């Protein structure tokens, strides 16, 4: 089957915004006008096509990026293929935004005309900068009370440090909003309310807006000629670019991320969506316009590039795993190069495993169509993959490559969870493992001491929704506990312990003597074991038992029962009995030997120190630093990034719970932070006493 649409006619883009700026409604309108949706779904009544998880429809927030393929006939009458990814705007779901930005070529940033640039707009904008994603801006909700297009333009400059190239001016605002002025064609588009936005009239610019339109067209031309020497020279000589040249310059500047074309409208009232779709064709990149994807050769580890070309070897990135109620597990993948046929065998180079593509689906929100073949630039859903997880590379087994992996933040909050009924234990385990496979920012583990199941995620809403999904999709009711910190223990000085284990009261006896030196491991946090036995005082075959015995005690330290780090043990002497000694006897002896020694070797409690990066507007720097200091934080430095300030600090995890709420209120929601594990550090003695008292009773 040959490729139906040329790769230069593809547009892979996402819609990103603050929560409630109208992303889902805008996507709905796009699907409606491109003919994929027969009825417009409203978020207000929980019927939106993209929001296909039950919870999203209830909460009216988009949680999962749904990938949709649709088609649009541009101004030139030629049909283009759109692959659209809808992304969430809530801070707990930034992982979804990150992973969709990684596989997109361009994006539409949505603003609420009333609120302008909101905190989460800043967050997703910075994420898009990280991946250098070309963006256009759509100033939505122009019909809303308080809508102010010109203030939004100003906020893009002051809050995002970005240049918006105004392509349209609004005609009227709030309830009077009825159309836009096209600054390239210099005409006005007035929508007919009764046609659901499908029809509009092209008329002359209203008399009272002509001067403003001229002023903004001049600004538009000045900005775009600035990126091209020849155009700039001609402009200085009084020769203005024609409309096609202006479009070509806007396209170039957008793809090079020099500036961002800005449009306006109201998706809810069906005004301004079609010109936005024409702009996607005119200004956002095709897969051919973006740099080749970088990777490393699986065998030689040399740097290589894969270009958006069907003739190149197959390479694709799995960016999302989803459980589909009808098909089972689906892996969403972006094909960067080559082509893929149904039934093909591909290699997962991250896991070093072969996978077979059982079914290949083209997704439209929550309906699907089976396809036989897919090409470079496509975003497809694959069924039948067993080993693949988010961020893995799938490729041609004969030309293996590892594409740059996605980075996922470490979970920052963990809670204990247990099923309400014993019978649900197994179902809960299965449900949690399924959910963890879908979402790399969600982790599940079992606490060795208490046997409790611990779940960890990006925030309280994130974990709420996991528990909620478990109840809805897997019918498991669960009880959750309070957040916990993973402490560790270590020793701080050298200690030599001599221990004899004997049991010789009738029957087969047990005998083993060990003399071991315990000390901090200078090489790091791992456990290191050495034997310096000479002369056979402990026979060779018993030495693994000595190591095993010590290792079995490392999981529970002497202070509060936390796992131990950074211990080195050297077996220097011992004794055995010809009949009564065994591997087990030496295991028991070394276990008891370490238990005794740990109490005498300066045991110390360690806590996880987190590397915290706060990005905040300058106004809040003093408050943020003061607050981090009050949390026993150590400020490592600060620097300017655009118009924001980045503060780096190391802070104990124990003092970071509820931090997101504090930071939001301290900065009116404008600051954001990331937190990753850095190292373990000794707990101050006054805090250690409290922790020991709290946990010793539990262990």
UniProtKB/Swiss-Prot annotation:
<dbReference type="Pfam" id="PF03764">
    <property type="entry name" value="EFG_IV"/>
</dbReference>
<dbReference type="GO" id="GO:0005525">
    <property type="term" value="F:GTP binding"/>
</dbReference>
<dbReference type="Pfam" id="PF14492">
    <property type="entry name" value="EFG_III"/>
</dbReference>
<feature type="binding site">
    <location>
        <begin position="17"/>
        <end position="24"/>
    </location>
    <ligand>
        <name>GTP</name>
    </ligand>
</feature>
<dbReference type="GO" id="GO:0003924">
    <property type="term" value="F:GTPase activity"/>
</dbReference>
<feature type="binding site">
    <location>
        <begin position="86"/>
        <end position="90"/>
    </location>
    <ligand>
        <name>GTP</name>
    </ligand>
</feature>
<dbReference type="Pfam" id="PF00679">
    <property type="entry name" value="EFG_C"/>
</dbReference>
<keyword id="KW-0547">Nucleotide-binding</keyword>
<dbReference type="Pfam" id="PF00009">
    <property type="entry name" value="GTP_EFTU"/>
</dbReference>
<feature type="binding site">
    <location>
        <begin position="140"/>
        <end position="143"/>
    </location>
    <ligand>
        <name>GTP</name>
    </ligand>
</feature>
<dbReference type="GO" id="GO:0003746">
    <property type="term" value="F:translation elongation factor activity"/>
</dbReference>
<dbReference type="InterPro" id="IPR027417">
    <property type="entry name" value="P-loop_NTPase"/>
</dbReference>
<comment type="function">
    <text>Catalyzes the GTP-dependent ribosomal translocation step during translation elongation. During this step, the ribosome changes from the pre-translocational (PRE) to the post-translocational (POST) state as the newly formed A-site-bound peptidyl-tRNA and P-site-bound deacylated tRNA move to the P and E sites, respectively. Catalyzes the coordinated movement of the two tRNA molecules, the mRNA and conformational changes in the ribosome.</text>
</comment>
<keyword id="KW-0342">GTP-binding</keyword>
<comment type="similarity">
    <text>Belongs to the TRAFAC class translation factor GTPase superfamily. Classic translation factor GTPase family. EF-G/EF-2 subfamily.</text>
</comment>
<feature type="domain" description="tr-type G">
    <location>
        <begin position="8"/>
        <end position="288"/>
    </location>
</feature>
<dbReference type="InterPro" id="IPR041095">
    <property type="entry name" value="EFG_II"/>
</dbReference>
<keyword id="KW-0648">Protein biosynthesis</keyword>
<dbReference type="GO" id="GO:0005737">
    <property type="term" value="C:cytoplasm"/>
</dbReference>
<dbReference type="InterPro" id="IPR009022">
    <property type="entry name" value="EFG_III"/>
</dbReference>
<dbReference type="GO" id="GO:0032790">
    <property type="term" value="P:ribosome disassembly"/>
</dbReference>
<dbReference type="InterPro" id="IPR020568">
    <property type="entry name" value="Ribosomal_Su5_D2-typ_SF"/>
</dbReference>
<keyword id="KW-0963">Cytoplasm</keyword>
<dbReference type="InterPro" id="IPR035647">
    <property type="entry name" value="EFG_III/V"/>
</dbReference>
<dbReference type="Pfam" id="PF22042">
    <property type="entry name" value="EF-G_D2"/>
</dbReference>
<protein>
    <recommendedName>
        <fullName>Elongation factor G</fullName>
    </recommendedName>
</protein>
<dbReference type="InterPro" id="IPR014721">
    <property type="entry name" value="Ribsml_uS5_D2-typ_fold_subgr"/>
</dbReference>
<dbReference type="InterPro" id="IPR047872">
    <property type="entry name" value="EFG_IV"/>
</dbReference>
<dbReference type="InterPro" id="IPR005517">
    <property type="entry name" value="Transl_elong_EFG/EF2_IV"/>
</dbReference>
<dbReference type="InterPro" id="IPR004540">
    <property type="entry name" value="Transl_elong_EFG/EF2"/>
</dbReference>
<keyword id="KW-0251">Elongation factor</keyword>
<dbReference type="InterPro" id="IPR009000">
    <property type="entry name" value="Transl_B-barrel_sf"/>
</dbReference>
<dbReference type="InterPro" id="IPR005225">
    <property type="entry name" value="Small_GTP-bd"/>
</dbReference>
<dbReference type="InterPro" id="IPR035649">
    <property type="entry name" value="EFG_V"/>
</dbReference>
<dbReference type="InterPro" id="IPR000795">
    <property type="entry name" value="T_Tr_GTP-bd_dom"/>
</dbReference>
<dbReference type="InterPro" id="IPR053905">
    <property type="entry name" value="EF-G-like_DII"/>
</dbReference>
<dbReference type="InterPro" id="IPR031157">
    <property type="entry name" value="G_TR_CS"/>
</dbReference>
<dbReference type="InterPro" id="IPR000640">
    <property type="entry name" value="EFG_V-like"/>
</dbReference>
